Amino acid sequence: MAISRDSNAIVYLTFSNSGISVSGDGAKVSGTTVTIEKSGTYLAQGLSDEGNIVVGSSSVVLYLQHLVLSSKITAPIVVNSKLDDVKIINIQNTTLKDYEAETTTSGECAVIKVKKKSVVSFENQGLFTLYGECKNVIKGGAETSLIFANSNGEYKITAEKTGIASDGYLEFNLGKYTIISKNGDAIKSNPEDTDTASLGKILVNSGTFNIECLNDAFTAKTNLTVVKGTFDIKTENGYDSTTFDKDTSSAKGFKVKNNDTGCEMKLLDGEYNLNTADDAFHSNRDLTILKGKYIIYAGDDGVHASFNLVLGEKDAPNDELDLQVLSSYEGIEGMTITINSGRIVATAEDDGINAAGGDSGDQPGPGPRPGPWNKTRSNLRKGRLGEPGPGPSPGGRGNASYYISIYGGEVYVFCDGDGIDSNGNIFIHGGDIKVFSQGNRDNEPVDHDGNFTLFNGDLLGVGSRGMEQIHLGIKKGNEMYAYYSGAITKDKTLRIKNENGEVVKEGEITKDINYIFFSSLKLNNSYKFYVTDSTGTESELKFTFGQPESGDDDEDVHDNN
């Protein structure tokens, strides 16, 4: 898209190293600065090693066309405070650079600075390259709104600290965003605690985001919503970082900071490829993931909600949500966890799916969080063993505050700690659940401090004898169960075959185990269980079959799905 000089409605701002020329009324030049004083349409072009545009009026459209503009004393573009309906539109390749020193007292330390209470929308039809050598690239102050409208172009952002920030509100609609943040966050809306007027919200309607940053990729103080989009994110040195210190830094993929009522993260759809030194997804309040594809490698938790975590829509097809935590300390964690549907994979060095309380790193907590394991990678990460506890849990401290409810989905857990672990209760209403842990009695495939109730669904637990009493939670008349107690060494394949010899369940045993439990509506005493070693030799395991003895279905009084 190019704009012709024949348009009399456009005021042209032409930069060169010898000065700035203005083609009409509405803008005033003073030294290396041109100030837009009246509403209207303007086009900036040219090249200058020291220049600056100040938008001083509402209802301004500022086109950028083949503009190369740098400044060592202020931001190349400044939008003054309390302005509405300001549009900045890149229609041809534009490069903006800020070379200010961070110690400057008169500058803006940004490439584009939007001041308090202004509303600015951005459109990009070409390549928009922005370098922030001082601090930030695009920065909105208190109560600002920055809206990135539908665009076909690419934002190529390199920031010393933050790539895109607004204390008030950020919204993204289409476009490609390539962001490198050397010493800060990539995208954030995180006003100071003393600023109670700014919203601290981020909405992503769409877009393609390629992000590398030292700290968090997306941070919102109160609310972060993704409707859809494509995200390729790496924080710090990735999930296997040996330099990340969680006690002094935060390097999460997506984060909601506050834990006040109403604060939440919602991921409605999208494609995500996350490689984070810290948690991949972290909300200090609630977190909902409904649809999309998620590939997660996390140095700490894969998915964490300090309060309520919901995965999948109830009764939805499982292929609508594909959530794969392929490496983590704890796979999926929340005070309450509700799994409705989807394909859920949790791979963890500690617990796979864990209902526990409080925050895991952004706010202090009262209790110890044990660190008994000795993984080489994990020990190299600072602050893991004997670290401070997970923080305060809301409401009562009893078991009733914590629960896991599974209504459906295909759930796969591979872990060194407990597979499905609740500080309170576990309710299984449906789904196909496979848990592979290890033979250490302190780490069980299913562990709970409150009650365990299996109303419906298939459950396969492979690991230790600590879950020997799990059958007591199966509701009478619903399920049959079978178990095997005996040592089985690692590197074998477990297969369960029905009366017709068809394989109905299988999985890889990658750790030494001593107990297997299986329950299903379809199970009968004609089923057979086998393990196959690396040579292909198949051996039958002699399982014990049983019927549940518990009474009528109990009401799931703790489930608020």
Residue ranges, per PLM feature:
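A composition-driven surface/loop motif
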Residues: 1-561
